[in-house]
Swiss-Prot record:
Entry keyword Cytoplasm: yes
Organism domain of life: Bacteria
Main location: cytoplasm
The protein's name: Glucose-6-phosphate isomerase
Native source species: Anaeromyxobacter sp. (strain K)
Pathway the protein acts in: Carbohydrate biosynthesis; gluconeogenesis; Carbohydrate degradation; glycolysis; D-glyceraldehyde 3-phosphate and glycerone phosphate from D-glucose: step 2/4
Amino acid sequence: MPDRTGPLLRTPAWRALEAHLAELQPLHLRELFARDPGRGERLVADGAGLHLDYSKQRVTEETVRLLAALAEARGLPERRAAMFRGEKVNVTEGRAVLHVALRAPRGERILVDGSDVVPEVHAVLDRMAAFADQVRSGAWTGFTGKRIRTVVNVGIGGSDLGPAMAYRALRAYATRDLAFRFVSNVDGTDLAEAVRDLDPAETLFLVASKTFTTLETMTNAASARSWLLAALGDPRAVARHFVAISTNEAEVRRFGIDPANMFGFWDWVGGRYSMDSAIGLSTMIAVGPEGFRELLAGFREMDEHFRDAPLERNLPALIGLLGVWNANLLGAETVAVLPYDQYLDRFPAYLQQLTMESNGKRVTASGAPVEGHGTGAIYWGEPGTNGQHSFYQLLHQGTHLVACDFIGFCRPLHALARHHDLLMANLFAQGEALAFGKTAEEARAEGTPEPLVPHRTFPGNRPSSTILADRLTPRTLGALVALYEHAVFTQGVIWDVDSFDQWGVELGKVLANRIVKELESPAEPALAHDGSTNALIRRYRARRGG
């Protein structure tokens, strides 16, 4: 039986990995390639249009075999099947986890509590498509009869990061008849700058909040409504300029939005897994229903690859297991996501929520403390080549071991071919430099003065993977996002954490609700926080002005 819920470090599969590490750790990547020149052609895997080269990871084929054995021992195949079947694998909230149903084809059956959810998914997609076509064609007009020119998505977390990332990633495919802006921060600057130069009569707001009570989103939505009504006057204008992505019809109606323009989703879709649900309405308006269907097809193709491919050739499983190897055995606590494509400039930020909110847990799914190992690596990054002139110094010569995921495309979406060759040359060069470095002898052979030799030496042996695709398309983006979704799931199974809850965000919300009343109190409030927080509140109240 799989040893899924016992302490990870006590499992025979983990101990086998530790013994293997003792043999492998003394070997530099230079030595691994010297012993096995063909590893660059063998330590690769392909799926859903993506090519993964992990030969510059500090692993061998035996490492991958042992990692796959660990996944088997922790019950990954069984947990994966349970998720696809619609079982309640989000144990702390008692919910199914079925983002895979959002991209299931018509006719497939996926049951939640005995009910097939696929027809519901496609009913929403069909309504989204009809609405998107209306906005794109100009058939949907504002209250004064003007055509919509700007779409503003108002959300936070998964209701913002996914749509904002997808729009920036797919700008090459987006209609040029519409502009798109995204508001998430409760900081009024975000909304003020988003609407600064807009004509209210030509602006459509998409308000994304499942409950329609999310503090940040509804604060921004209320201010946006005030901005609109200050210009258009008539409260009936709200129904032509606001659309809801929500399941709370009563609150939607109270806000002034026609429930006919409410697009729902389900409690089996977590926010950070929702960009291909109704939360993606802004994406569909931008790239059109056909482009959105291509996005879903890419998700689906990777879903099927994750479900069916052997673990040792399974891209999401490999990404997830290599992450466990790097974090828990090699000590690389952070992952730099380095897309060599400017269109993916928000992809690292998107992955921050997907990975860190999912697996940043200190207790197991059953509530026991995680024993003796970390969970949830820290994800960060910037597009190449910007990062090379920022933080790559630390990657190459710093004291922290950082695992890197390079992402690149063989064909650009522009006609500046030499630019792309230079870009990709840098991608390949960085992976090579991180892996092999430069020895003191090589530095001296180049004529480096002896006092500078230590400064011109690169240790190498820094692990990285490279993900290549032919071109960035909606389909490729869907596959890329699903790759990391399922990698996160894989890691959650290994660590035995619930990757689909986020209780850690709750305490700050509760305290903020208490503090805002103290900030807004006309009389001096009786503060009962710690001394630091009390002093900060008093200083703010004294200095904020009128």
